[in-house]
Structure formats: C-alpha cells, structure tokens
Design a protein with these regions (language model features):
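Glycine-rich short-loop/terminal segments
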Residues: 1-2
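Surface-exposed intrinsically disordered loops and tails
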Residues: 5-23
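Amphipathic, interaction-prone secondary-structure segments
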Residues: 19-62
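Polar low-complexity intrinsically disordered regions enriched in Ser/Thr and small residues
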Residues: 24-26, 70, 116-117
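Generic structural hydrophobic/aromatic packing signal, biased to beta-strands
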Residues: 34, 66-68, 105
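Acidic, aromatic-enriched beta-alpha/helix-loop junctions
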Residues: 47-88
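Low-complexity intrinsically disordered segments
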Residues: 73-125
Length: 125
C-alpha cells in the first residue's frame, strides 16, 4: 500500500469551526502511527498546521510530515529537522522530517516490507 492510499483510508478529520470561511484552517487531522512488517515505525501526518503539501484535507498529497521513526533511516536523512546541542550526538529518531516527498515515503515503506495494516490499526485502537 502506498502512502496516499493509507492517508485516504485512515485520515481522521475533526472540524473545529463550522464557518465555511474558516473550515479549511480550523481542522484537526490525525493518522495512526505506521508499523511496517519488519517492525520499523514512523508517524506520517498531513494537514493545515503540519509540514505537508497541500496544507488542507486533500485526496492526494505531494509531501508529508514524518516524525519519530523507530530507527535512523538513511533515505530520510536529507529532510531531518535537527536541533544539535552537542555535535557528537545527533538523534534521528526524536525529531521530525518536514515536507518529505510521497515517492520517497513509498520507498521507505517498501524497504521495510510495507505497512503492517493489522498491527498499525491495532496499536491505534
């Protein structure tokens, strides 16, 4: 399953303001933490206040926000948002990765055996 299909099937949207002029910016969106078949996990999020494109609820996304992968993933490194307090210590798992292209996310998922949908949804419940 590719990431846009996962988003389409699992995105939870809560409208916080019914005013039509505010509706697109007053929403809360949430996706379950992804678990891959090899055990790798990461958060993938999209929406107005997140590092994704587009920044609204959409049918397809070109870029997504990734957060807190369970291990360092070399395919994502160029997108890491780091706060380096000590140059000898860089934690690639306790941070976010803004505006990651969905094609790259699909490569990461494939590398880790794809999404284990049963485990992903079980942990989200």
């Amino acid at each position: 399953m590719k990431i846009n299909e996962f988003i389409k099937n699992n995105l939870k949207v809560k409208v916080l303001n019914e005013d039509p002029s505010m509706r697109h910016i007053m929403t809360s969106t949430r996706l379950p933490h992804i678990v891959c078949t090899d055990g790798f996990t990461m958060s993938v999020q999209v929406g107005y206040s997140l590092y994704s494109e587009p920044k609204k609820v959409a049918k397809r996304y070109s870029k997504v926000e990734i957060g807190y992968p369970s291990e360092r993933e070399s395919l994502l490194e160029e997108y890491v948002e780091l706060s380096i307090f000590d140059e000898r210590f860089v934690d690639y798992t306790d941070t976010i990765y803004p505006y990651v292209p969905v094609k790259l996310v699909d490569k990461v998922l494939k590398k880790h055996g794809g999404i284990d949908l049963t485990e992903t949804l079980r942990k989200a419940a």
